[in-house]
UniProtKB/Swiss-Prot annotation:
CDD domains: PDRG1. May play a role in chaperone-mediated protein folding. GO terms for molecular function: unfolded protein binding. It comes from Rattus norvegicus. This is p53 and DNA damage-regulated protein 1. One of its GO terms (biological process) is protein folding. One of its GO terms (cellular component) is RPAP3/R2TP/prefoldin-like complex. Belongs to the prefoldin subunit beta family.
Length: 133
């Protein structure tokens, strides 16, 4: 029979491992989505440089190439970019919570400044007005 102390340590290690696995999983997903976002950005840039707007372009979906209208392709990639941006932002906000839970389970203090958010355009403009005078 396992002693109560060993059982408690085992439960603690299982909890910490599960929390750490969730953090690593989210980080990996963010990296994968960011890679896809960069590929989309490259595709959009190539479409912007292409002067033949009236011609169809070849688009790769997985392992298959499809000929699509230039404008429709551009719109589709832009919508995908918006979706990826939202998904990455959602994962990053969840990641902050999961990291705090992991630190709490390990008995470590919460990271300072980890919950900061960047200023949006309106806040930045207001700050610039205040600083100018």
């Amino acid at each position: 029979m396992v002693s109560p102390e060993a059982d408690r340590v085992l439960r603690y290690l299982v909890e910490v491992e599960e929390l750490a696995e969730a953090v690593l999983s989210d980080k990996r997903q963010i990296v994968d989505l960011d890679t896809k976002r960069n590929q989309n950005r490259e595709g959009l840039r190539a479409l912007q440089k292409d002067p033949s707007v009236s011609e169809d372009v070849m688009v790769c979906f997985g392992n298959m190439f499809i000929k699509m209208p230039h404008l429709k392709t551009k719109e589709m990639i832009q919508k995908d970019q918006e979706h990826l941006d939202k998904e990455i932002e959602r994962l990053r906000s969840q990641l902050k919570v999961k990291v705090n839970r992991l630190l709490e389970a390990q008995g470590k203090p919460e990271l300072k400044g980890f919950n900061l958010n960047p200023l949006n355009q309106d806040e930045l403009k207001a700050l610039q007005v205040i600083l100018k005078g």
